[in-house]
Amino acid sequence: MATQICTPTFSAGSAKGLCGTSGSFSRISSIHSMGSCRAPSLVGTVGSVSSFRTGFSGPGSCLPGSYLSSGCHSSGFAGSGGWFCEGAFNGNEKATMQILNDRLANYLEKVRQLEQENTQLECRIREWYECQIPYICPDYQSYFKTAEELQQKILLTKSENARLILQIDNAKLAADDFRTKYETELSLRQLVEADINGLRRILDELTLCKADLEAQVESLKEELLCLKRNHEEEVNALRSQLGDRLNVEVDAAPPVDLNKILDDMRCQYETLVENNRRDVEAWFNTQTEELNQQVVSSSEQLQCCQTEIIELRRTVNSLEIELQAQQSMRNSLESTLAETEARYSSQLGQMQCLITNVESQLAEIRCDLERQNHEYQVLLDVKARLESEIATYRRLLDGEDCKLPAHPCSTECKPAVRVPYIPSTTCTPAGPCTPAGPCTPAPQVSTQIRTITEEIRDGRVISSREHVVPRAM
């Protein structure tokens, strides 16, 4: 009696059998060879323990689903596992049923757990999308307008301050001009007073000279009178002496009139004094006029020089004030430019940091989305495989029983169970075995990956895009 040995090997997400099966599920068709019959076997994957319930349709009937033959043993399904079915049919149906029921319960529990995890992940993704409110750049237009108004006010205030400073400087210059004029007039007054004092001293000296001359004239007059008296006395004395002695008549020259001579001398002296006085007065007048002319010319020149100096000082002060105003305006403009550059550079740095942060957040979100999409794809793949496996088990449980002959070595076997078939799965016997029928393809299970992209702004959905990707199992 020849038997077919089929040893499927499990891996994460796929199953391969040594009989040539590959894909997510492995099916072995019913084989009738040398009077022995073996029912098809279906094995699940994805790290979960798969089990299903089988039943007997009666004595001599073929077991639907999967059964354990003699010498068949199972290994753990933590990530990988396999069935090694060798030998004949095992008669311990109750133990087999118990094991299969336990495996089915574990499988259903694992399915429910995965569904709960899928629901939790969907809730977390939804909450994360709700929490991730798109960053709205604040509107700085009002602040820019306020800043421009403040800058205009600052410029107007600076210009007003410059105008007030210019007026103050002009007032200071006018005060300096008046002070200079006052000092000039004061110096002129002092000079005139000094000249007057000098002229008064000269007048006093001339008065003293006049008094001296008058005193001299008086003394000369007194001396002349004394001389006249003495002369008369001498003449009288001589006459008296001559009268007593001799009367001598002498024919002499006429006598000299002394009064006339004195009058002539007096006239000469008076004319001389008058001439001297006129000369001195003329000289004094000429000297005074020359001095006054020199003083006037000097004062005029001094006044001209002082006015020129004042004008030059005023011009210099106005130019200095204008220079200071221009320098202050330049400094204010430079400070304003520096402040503007610093403000815009800081705003640019903040925006650059914000852009960098947003880009990093977008990169993180993209990585999270890719990771979650990958996990979601893996979960969808697992879910689809589990659903297909559940559907397969359900069809196996709800299908018709396969009637087997009473004798295990009968030459015919009519399987009553149709198992889904993966197109890439082939049945290759390990020994001489004649299959009961050709391998018919089972219906394919197709899945769709639906990606919904929503753009949310201020808590409102602006746009929504849906992308459906068909995926065949």
UniProtKB/Swiss-Prot annotation:
**Biological processes, Gene Ontology terms:** regulation of keratinocyte differentiation
Could you list this entry's UniProt keywords, alphabetically sorted.
Coiled coil, Intermediate filament, Keratin
Q: Where is this region: Coil 1B?
A: 140-240
Superkingdom of the source?
A: Eukaryota
Give all residue intervals belonging to the IF rod domain.
Answer: 93-404
One Pfam family per UniProt = Filament
Q: In which tissues is it expressed?
A: In skin, only expressed in the suprabasal cells of tail scale epidermis. Suprabasally expressed in stratified squamous epithelia and also in the posterior unit of the complex filiform papillae of tongue. Expressed in rare anatomical sites in which an orthokeratinized stratum corneum would be too soft and a hard keratinized structure would be too rigid to meet the functional requirement of the respective epithelia.
Q: Region annotation Coil 1A: residue ranges?
A: 94-128
List the Gene3D superfamilies.
1.20.5.170, Single helix bin, Vasodilator-stimulated phosphoprotein
Linker 1 as annotated region, ranges: 129-139
- Which intervals of the chain are annotated as region Linker 12? 241-256
Q: Where is this region: Tail?
A: 401-473
Q: State a single Gene Ontology molecular function.
A: structural constituent of skin epidermis
- Annotated region (Coil 2), positions in chain: 257-400
User: Which chain positions carry the site (Stutter)?
Assistant: 342
Q: Does the keyword Coiled coil apply?
A: yes
Similarity-based family = Belongs to the intermediate filament family.
Q: Share what the entry says about its subunit structure, partners included.
A: Heterotetramer of two type I and two type II keratins.
Q: What else is known?
A: There are two types of hair/microfibrillar keratin, I (acidic) and II (neutral to basic).
- Annotated protein name in UniProt: Keratin, type I cuticular Ha6
**Origin organism of this chain?**
Mus musculus (Mouse)
